[in-house]
Amino acid sequence: MSLVRLIGAEARHLAKRSYSSAAPTTKLFIDGKFVESKTNEWIDVHDPATNQVVTRVPKATQAEMQAALESNKKAFRSWSNQSILTRQQVMFKLQALIKENMGELAKNITKEQGKTLADAEGDVLRGLQVVEHCCSIPSLQMGETVANVARDMDTYSLVLPLGVTAGVAPFNFPAMIPLWMFPVAITTGNTMLLKPSERVPGATMLLMELLNEAGCPPGVVNVIHGQHDAVNFICDAPEIKAVSFVGSDQAGKYIYERAGKNGKRVQSNMGAKNHGIILGDANKENTLNQLAGAAFGAAGQRCMALSTAVFVGDAQAWIPDLVERAQKLKVNAGHVPGTDVGPVISAASRQRINDLIESGVKEGAKLILDGRKITVPGYEDGYFVGPTILSDVTPSMKCYTEEIFGPVLVILKADTLDDAIGIVNANPYGNGTAVFTTNGAAARKFVNEIDAGQVGVNVPIPVPLPMFSFTGTRGSFRGDHHFYGKQGIKFYTQTKTVTQLWRKTDVTHTQAAVAMPTMK
């Protein structure tokens, strides 16, 4: 039985018995093998719906992290010299294996992260789409050639890998974000040292089993676990040439600065405050349904969650209808059929969310839907927050200036579209935004004037497919190249430009030319 099936069986077994300190340990993945850590420091991973421990994650030792890095270095020498078709074949096989095992991956994500099974499958699917895009690597990594730039002279460019790269992934998308990282890195010829979130390690470990089955050589991807020491190791190791990060502002800025000072290329996706602008001419029913789903789906724990709504003019009369829709959403454990909103990731997250809700009330916002005291029968120890709506919020309130990252929608009001655009552009974040309207001229004005990296027109969560790139801007991103798509290929590669001269007359002896070359 493969590791995927073993872990799936263990998860089902754990669900049937009482939890104990005898929870299984998560392994490191080094040189193609799952390795038990020798550390004496462990992190408990809790099922957010039950608060019960499902696994223990090691804080990898310095020796273990160094061993993983040495394995990456060794593998790069051979992997980068493999034909591009060989690397493509690994992606073809990985794509098929992920499809076959999507159910097991989704169950693991729900157990460790809490999101609904349907949302967990979407998590896997959006990552799978990046793998599918990587199957086009012979075209994506193609260089350029100009023949006869001068007489008998040709110039061409090669798109080459960097070397050892690293990825630091967040808790909210246990499969999708690692799949943003390692497939692009390794298909372009790099190797990768990957650190998944210590809160949700399981999906990454399942993906490593599938990567082995796909025929990826040992050491091309290694996985370490940990917290600050692991991040510092990645930022400081001179052998690592590039670091990909998705997560919080604090961690993202830290990694960007520390890794950058050490000469590494960095892409850092960070926080967001995504606004939905609702105009009075929008399709009311569709707009309110999309707004509720985008605000409260995944318990609001998406970097592209529509956490802020700006109702313009006559659309302000729709706010009570939005509350009614939010009240109908079912809050329960993620594996329970029919669940719309699962738990948040931890007790600390729940407390932070509740504190931000309370701060809004104290600063004058109207709490028109309060989900703080929700109780889910059978899951009384879970980390649940029900859909919550704060209205009459102003840009100076803490609930607006900080990313809540929970099932909380803050509502602002504006008289005109110009006012709404001004609100969005004054916010320091620039990850995503959306406008809801049936007026093409209004939509075009919004698209042209809004200062955000990803814009939806009647699309609440405009995350691009992998033929494009995830293009957050301003306070939501630091770096030069974004994730996946053409920019993702650029991030993990470097260009070597070759100019070669083969004169026809070189077949005979000629006199040396000492004048400055003029390229004529």
Curated annotation (Swiss-Prot):
Q: Which PANTHER family match?
A: MALONATE-SEMIALDEHYDE DEHYDROGENASE (PTHR43866), METHYLMALONATE-SEMIALDEHYDE DEHYDROGENASE [ACYLATING], MITOCHONDRIAL (PTHR43866:SF3)
The taxonomic lineage of its organism, from the top, reads:
Eukaryota, Metazoa, Ecdysozoa, Arthropoda, Hexapoda
Q: Could you tell me one molecular function GO term of this UniProt entry?
A: malonate-semialdehyde dehydrogenase (acetylating) activity
- Main localization is mitochondrion
Report what the protein is called: Probable methylmalonate-semialdehyde/malonate-semialdehyde dehydrogenase [acylating], mitochondrial
Described function: Probable malonate and methylmalonate semialdehyde dehydrogenase involved in the catabolism of valine, thymine, and compounds catabolized by way of beta-alanine, including uracil and cytidine.
What is this enzyme's class at the first EC digit? oxidoreductase
Q: Which residues form the active site?
A: 303 (nucleophile)
Subcellular locations according to the entry: Mitochondrion
Stored Gene3D superfamilies? Aldehyde Dehydrogenase, Chain A, domain 1, Aldehyde Dehydrogenase, Chain A, domain 2
Source species of the chain: Drosophila melanogaster
What is the protein's quaternary organization? Answer: Homotetramer.
Per the UniProt entry, the Enzyme Commission number(s) are 1.2.1.27
